[in-house]
Amino acid sequence: MNLIEKICSNPSEYTLNVERLGECKIDSPIRNRDFIDDDERILVTENVKSLQLATERLGMTPSFERAGPHHKIFHDPAWSRVGIVTAGGLCPGLNHVIKGLVEILVCDYGIRTIYGIRYGYAGLIPRFGYEPFMLDTDTVDTVHENGGTMLGSSRGQQDTGEIVDTLARMNINLLFCIGGDGSL
């Protein structure tokens, strides 16, 4: 069963919109970039027959919100603290993603507090004793030359309440989760 068939057979299981924390009121600090409008969407599939079927059954064309920089943002970069975690199975390019993310956060958004969370979500559970470490453009400068993930990874479910408590204690208001199927 393809994704369109799954969506049509049980639409309540699939959320194609991203929930918002609140209204985005802060001007983006990014300059010289094309911005994404809030109403831009990407089709779930390019197959016209599947799209027609889904549109008839659902009364809408299945699509995702388009990712990318927006004119207005929610979190003020001057006060933002970021955590980056890699979880699930290893997949190619994790260190490239970490490097690119840190560079954009620092150079484009001006964020200065970025924590690398060790060993997946287990790194957010205090009893495991994995201390986070600071990431900056120097610490990720050559990381893309190595395989795997500089942060380490782990599999297995962790207690969501404990994770949220740790994020609150560390004042992390942005958490980037990178990885394979197990990262969600």
What is each model feature region?
Residues 119, 180-181:
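An acidic- and aromatic-residue-enriched active-site/binding cleft used to recognize and process polar
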Residues 1-24, 75-125:
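N-terminal phosphate-binding or glycine-rich loops at protein starts, especially the Walker A/P-loop
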Residues 81-91, 149-152, 173-179:
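Short glycine-rich or small-residue beta-strand-to-loop segments that form or flank ligand, phosphate
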Residues 35-75, 122-175:
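Glycine-rich oxoanion-binding loops at beta->alpha junctions
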Residues 184:
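Mid-domain, small-residue-enriched loop/turn segments at the edges of structured enzyme/sensor domains
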Residues 2-60:
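Helix-enriched interaction subdomains in cytosolic or periplasmic regions
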